[in-house]
Regions:
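C-terminal motif of bacterial Sec signal peptides marking the signal peptidase cleavage site
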Residues: 17-21
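Early extracytoplasmic/lumenal segment of secretory-pathway proteins
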Residues: 23, 33, 37-119
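A structural signal for short loop-to-beta-strand junctions that line the ligand-binding cleft
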Residues: 47, 104-109, 127-165, 179, ...
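Periplasmic solute-binding protein
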Residues: 114-125, 145-173, 201-211, 288-294
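Short beta-strand->loop
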Residues: 127-135, 150-151, 179-182, 253, ...
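Ligand-binding pocket segment of bilobal, Venus flytrap-like solute-binding proteins
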Residues: 200-285
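Mature extracytoplasmic/periplasmic domains
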Residues: 293-352
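Extracellular/periplasmic bilobal clamshell ligand-binding domains
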Residues: 338-375
């Protein structure tokens, strides 16, 4: 899930991306994985358990992280050395991959999400691969993919977060739903991110489109604007700057962030750590984000790349995700750390839109939002 650089541990060796140079063990697919009838056997062929010394280059967004020991264990077991190359946010990584389609600068790409999926798949940048471990992935996440181009690795929700301590001090009740955010009693209290420059900003815009439809979302934003909503370019400026719980004397107790922000607040607090977060998530109006990994078409290390995809669905990686990237694992039954179980929000009715609809309309929606809110 593309999120800003907040809270990400320094747990992986990372190289910079420049355009100029920029458990392989498997289980058989059960009923939960869907039928493989009619699928090219080459697409489902599992990679070998180990390799001659091989380097696999992973292209990823800046927020990718994995614990050093988890990655080292994979490398020791398989003989594969993983070179992680980060190149900005998810949109930037996908754009660069599209520009180099067929002659990729890496072997595997992680971080394409459901707002970018149709564009990436339509550009033909991925070689199809159906991991045997896909059977263990949540069915709703598997349903987003056709043609075995990519594999769901994690998911999370972009949600409105509120500063509970601020509202308690003022004797006010925090907003409970999207409609409440336009109430005059919350005037000048909310900060959001620009959808043209921010992943959570785009997610929140898409949430309002999913809720209010083509005929109503601009009216909703007109009400937010009239109610004094502030727009920042990115998450850092909004959460760490203008949000009253962000640590820098911000004055706005309502911000667009992530459902996993409250547990992150505890994990990365200085000692003595608080027993509970001072912020919470407004469960209404969250937008579900899903991140995928895929083997890049044209790689000369396709089998090793497939092994890395399998690794991302294995329990060592899946268990590591919550506290490395503050996302939920895609594999059903993966245990969560206590801090996630207690404090990460799990909205029952997250909003979403079909990836193809997002791809077809994203630029138009962002342009219309810019005209309605910033001009």
């Amino acid at each position: 899930m593309r999120r800003p650089l907040f809270f990400c541990p320094v747990t992986v060796v990372v190289a910079s991306l420049a355009l100029a140079a920029c458990s392989s063990g498997s289980t058989s697919l059960g009923a939960s994985g869907g039928s493989t009838a009619g699928v090219d056997p080459a697409v489902t062929a599992a990679p070998p358990a180990s390799f001659a010394p091989t380097t696999v280059t992973l292209l990823a967004h800046d927020s990718f992280a994995v614990s050093k020991q988890v990655l080292a264990d994979f490398e020791a077991r398989t003989g594969i050395t993983v070179k992680v190359v980060t190149g900005g946010d998810a949109g930037e990584v996908v754009n660069k991959a599209v520009l180099t389609a067929g002659e990729p600068e890496g072997d595997v790409l992680f971080g394409v999400d459901n707002t970018l999926l149709s564009r990436a798949v339509g550009a033909g940048i991925f070689a199809p691969y159906r991991s045997a471990l896909l059977a263990d992935v949540r069915p709703d996440l598997r349903a987003l993919v056709t043609g075995n181009a990519v594999t769901p690795v994690d998911y999370g929700d972009i949600c409105v977060n509120v500063d509970d301590a601020w509202f308690a001090k003022k004797g006010m009740t925090p907003p409970a739903d999207l409609a409440a955010l336009t109430d005059p009693k919350y005037k000048d209290l909310m900060v959001v991110e620009n959808p043209a420059t921010s992943s959570p900003g785009l997610g929140f815009l898409l949430a309002t489109i999913a809720r209010y439809g083509a005929g109503g979302w601009k009216d909703y934003w007109a009400k937010l604007r009239a109610n004094g909503v502030k727009v920042d370019d990115g998450w850092t400026a909004a959460y760490e700057g203008d949000f009253s719980a962000g640590g820098k004397d911000g004055s706005r107790p309502i911000v667009v962030s992530y459902a996993s922000s409250p547990p992150a607040e505890i994990v990365y607090a200085t000692d003595p750590k608080p027993t509970h977060p001072s912020t919470s998530v407004m469960a209404d109006g969250c937008f579900r984000q899903v991140e995928f990994v895929g083997v890049l078409k044209g790689t000369t290390h396709e089998q090793a790349a497939r092994a890395f995809v399998d690794f991302m669905l294995s329990q060592p990686f899946q268990r590591d995700e919550p506290l490395s990237m503050f996302v939920f694992p895609s594999v059903v039954g993966t245990p969560l750390p206590d801090v996630f179980t207690k404090w990460a929000a799990t909205p029952a009715d997250s909003l979403t839109l079909p990836p193809a609809e997002i791809t077809a309309n994203r630029e138009t929606w962002v342009d219309e939002w810019t005209q309605a809110v910033l001009h």
